């Protein structure tokens, strides 16, 4: 009953090819510093994820109330 035109194997291979190479061995130090450090040190926060302040998310879009790059 799957409506997808992809078989699971095809989908997996497609995703494998599409994934960016640096992610395979974890994030590199440059990307880690860019993504992780500002979130943790400029925006100290402790609490449940659903109460995380939107303004701390750099790609949060206030108009659509969503985070850019995620469905």
From Swiss-Prot:
The keyword ATP-binding does not apply. It comes from the Viruses. GO terms for cellular component: host cell nucleus; viral capsid. The keyword Membrane does not apply. Keywords: Capsid protein, Host nucleus, Late protein, Virion. Cleaved by the viral protease during virion maturation. May cause the middle segment to be shed from the capsid. Pfam families: Adeno_PVIII. The record marks 1-2 as: Cleavage. Induction: Expressed in the late phase of the viral replicative cycle. One of its GO terms (molecular function) is hexon binding. Disulfide bonds: none annotated. InterPro entries: Adeno_PVIII. Belongs to the adenoviridae hexon-linking protein family. Interacts with the peripentonal hexons as well as the hexons in the facets. Part of a complex composed of the core-capsid bridging protein, the endosome lysis protein VI and the hexon-linking protein VIII; these interactions bridge the virus core to the capsid. All late proteins expressed from the major late promoter are produced by alternative splicing and alternative polyadenylation of the same gene giving rise to non-overlapping ORFs. A leader sequence is present in the N-terminus of all these mRNAs and is recognized by the viral shutoff protein to provide expression although conventional translation via ribosome scanning from the cap has been shut off in the host cell. This is Pre-hexon-linking protein VIII.
